[in-house]
Every structure is written in C-alpha cells, then in structure tokens.
C-alpha cells in the first residue's frame, strides 16, 4: 500500500486548462500506479478547460462546488458527489460558472506509447 499525504502532492500543469491548480496524487511523475493517473483539481470561478479531446478515458468526481461539462453541445451541471465519464477522443469543455471554487478528483488512463 502507498499512502499519499495531501501535503506531499505536487502541482502539475494540464494542457488547455485555465484558472485552476492541480495536484498529482498517483500515477505519472507521482508514481504508485502505472495503470491510472489520479489528480485533484481546484477550478476558480470562470476557470475551466477545453474545448478539446484527448485519447485517455477520464472520470471526474465532484468533491465540492459545481462544474459545467459540455459534450456535443449539451451542458451538464455537476455538483458535489456527482461524476461523469469522458470517453477516448470525446470533445469536452469544462467551466466553473459559479462564484465558488470547484474541487474535483480526476482519474484517467495514462497515455500509451504509440
């Protein structure tokens, strides 16, 4: 078992994201898992990502606040304890349209070597 203390998590940059901070909990440079990447992201009001698509599958779990996820022109407002699955190469945009910080857990498969 590996325990990762919040105080030991390291920040990372995610492409096409804005108004956010993210901490890598497991996988990639944080180690611990070779089969998935888990991060914790905080989106400020007005912060978000995309629209874009990437090969890895993703799951978002909303810890607190609310986040609007836009896929195929349809908007879904996710609140605390809601989650969603984003498929491989599925174009999505996420936006925090609230006045509070939105905190989410992101789990995804690591990119595979081509």
Could you tell me what each predicted segment is?
Residues 88-113:
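Ligand-binding loop in jelly-roll beta-barrel domains
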Residues 1-35, 114:
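A short, N-terminal "cap"/entry segment at the start of jelly-roll beta-barrel domains
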Residues 48-50, 68, 84, 88-94:
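Histidine-centered metal-chelating micro-motifs
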Residues 74-88:
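Short acidic-glycine-tyrosine-enriched beta hairpin
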Residues 24-27, 38-54:
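Conserved short histidine dyad/triad with adjacent acidic residue
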Residues 15, 48-54, 95-97:
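Short histidine-centered beta-strand/loop micro-motifs
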Residues 66-68, 75, 91, 101:
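Structural motif
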Residues 40-43, 54-69:
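Short, conserved beta-strand element in jelly-roll/cupin
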């Amino acid at each position: 078992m590996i325990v990762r203390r919040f105080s030991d998590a390291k920040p990372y940059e995610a492409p096409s994201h804005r108004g956010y901070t993210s901490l890598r909990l497991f996988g990639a440079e944080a180690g611990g898992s070779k089969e998935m990447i888990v991060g914790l992201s905080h989106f400020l009001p007005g912060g978000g990502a995309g629209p874009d698509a990437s090969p890895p599958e993703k799951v978002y779990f909303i810890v607190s606040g609310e986040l609007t996820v836009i896929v195929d022109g349809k908007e879904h407002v996710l609140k605390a304890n809601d989650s969603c699955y984003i498929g491989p190469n599925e174009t999505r945009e996420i936006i925090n349209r609230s006045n509070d910080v939105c905190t989410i857990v992101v789990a995804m498969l690591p990119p595979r070597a081509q």
